[in-house]
From Swiss-Prot:
Gene3D superfamilies on file: NAD(P)-binding Rossmann-like Domain (3.40.50.720), Winged helix-like DNA-binding domain superfamily/Winged helix DNA-binding domain (1.10.10.10)
Gene Ontology biological process terms from the UniProt entry: negative regulation of DNA-templated transcription; response to redox state
A GO molecular-function descriptor: DNA-binding transcription factor activity
Name of this protein: Redox-sensing transcriptional repressor Rex
Family: Belongs to the transcriptional regulatory Rex family.
Keyword Transcription: yes
Function text: Modulates transcription in response to changes in cellular NADH/NAD(+) redox state.
Domain of life: Bacteria
Gene: rex
Record's GO cellular component terms: cytoplasm
DNA-binding region: 17-56
Subunit structure: Homodimer.
Amino acid sequence: MDRMEEPPDVVIRRLPLYARSLRYLLQEGVESVSSQELGDRINVTAAQIRKDLSYFGEFGKQGIGYNVRKLLQQIEDILGLTREWPVAVVGIGHLGEAIARYEGFRQQGIRIAGLFDSNPSKIGTVIDGMTVQSIEEADRIIREQGIRLAIIAVPARSAQEVTDRLVMAGVRAILSYAPTVLQVPDGVWVRYIDPVAILHSMTYYLARDINSARHNSPES
């Protein structure tokens, strides 16, 4: 049997959106949904949904649509959500602490399994029943807990050093809030969340509209 084509990263990023919408549909008591109805909920075309799902096999029936519960189970299986994933959080400042306390993780198969910081004032504090450990303990705990996912919320100047330590300990996927690009070996995946960069991409549209309004003003 021929191996399925590797799906583009953008497709993988959309799958959690499909899963979230399907969960809402289940809560609403909806049993079947068309690709058009599902697409309307997340601003994706029906054709795009069908194409995305085609990377992983055949789903639904033409003219009938998708069984909501079954499709959700299939997508969760694709995303590896049929098991629990332990996660390490490094950097327990205001942001890191908020991440550690986020209840949504527990509802979606993500378990915070380790909290780490280098600041002596943070080490030993307890967050939701879990003690913040020294970053020096990260290697041991990550290996003992079998942690493969990590979230880092540290300053840019220390982000690469932290990343190197995590990768050496066995972490293979990192969500970074540090405003810098990280260097990682093949087989390690990094996602970035940089609020400033995101806001700057939005100010482009605001500035464009303001400049357009000035240009079209009768006084200009």
